[in-house]
Amino acid sequence: MKKNIIILFLLLHQSFFAQSQTKIIDMHIHSYTDSDFGDREPSQDYYGKKGSKDAESHRIETFAAFEKFNIVKAMVSGNPESVENWVAKDDDHRIIRGILMFSPNDHEMDSVKFEQMVKDKKIEVFGETAPYYGGTTLSDSIWQPYLRICEKYDIPVAVHTGGGDPGGTYSWSPKARLKLGDPYLIEDVLVKYPKLRIYMMHAGGEDWPEHAIRLMAYYPQLYTDLAVMLWVEPNTQRYVKEFLQNIKEAGYLNRVMFGSDQMKWPYAIGKSVDFLNSLDFLTEQDKEDIFYNNAARFLKLKE
């Protein structure tokens, strides 16, 4: 009898803990198809942790993290096939459809196809846009037809800032150059499309966190996520800690949003949540705002 009471207490405690967790919106999640994994061994991260073995395992593990950490919405970018596969299996309606594009013609895309996908609600966020990897910037003329459509239909834009995969220029992204990750390179977009909802991904990375803050100071419509910075390496964690301290002091913390950028390592979602929660210079309200409130405002979510 005593054992049963203890078990009941533990179950009730776990249930209460799950219900009391802060709601989270993850503004930076990636989806994949099996072609992204191939037959090779799972990738290892900086810490030697192996990623998911295939696309379905990756989805299942990511969905489990959504449940565990009370992630109620997630902006998912990948190729359109992978995103739609996730949506079809998303019984809890968490997924916000994004699209991963390095170049304007990825996925055989053009402005006509793009606009139709927007109308059909197959694209709800234009991102992750990552011109950095394709050797361009979002301010270049080749991206303007898409941005005009986003402004017309009030579609948020998510743009990669900061650097990328170390050594990637020698392999899968030969056109990538570090200078292309400077947040200042999107300033012309902010000027040209003042009504556009836009957020930086990675908060300028390790390279330009101060540029990210200055840009947010000048352009009040600009937000940022913290994706990848919260988990991928000790150095990024150092930079994001300084970024959060500085942007809080500057008064723009209300435009900072949580993002994990789990890539092929779903465990990174929990690691990102835990690291943000460990920062004692942030108040509980600060954390609530970063985890949920700021993104809910940016996305114009209705309760």
Give the positions of each predicted feature.
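Mid-to-C-terminal alpha-helical segments outside catalytic/metal-binding sites
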Residues: 2-3, 19-30, 36, 45-73, ...
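Active-site gating loops and adjacent loop-to-helix segments of metal-dependent hydrolytic enzymes
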Residues: 33-57, 94, 165-169, 220-223
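Sec-dependent N-terminal signal peptides
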Residues: 4-13
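Active-site gating/metal-coordination segments in enzymes
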Residues: 81-168, 175-177
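Mid-chain, structured segments of secreted extracytoplasmic proteins
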Residues: 62-94
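Catalytic pocket-lining loop regions of alpha/beta-barrel enzymes
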Residues: 124, 139-257
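Hydrophobic faces of well-ordered beta-strands that scaffold small-molecule active sites
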Residues: 25-29, 74-76, 95-100, 125-128, ...
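Active-site environment of divalent metal-dependent phosphoester hydrolases
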Residues: 32-34, 80-84, 104, 132-134, ...
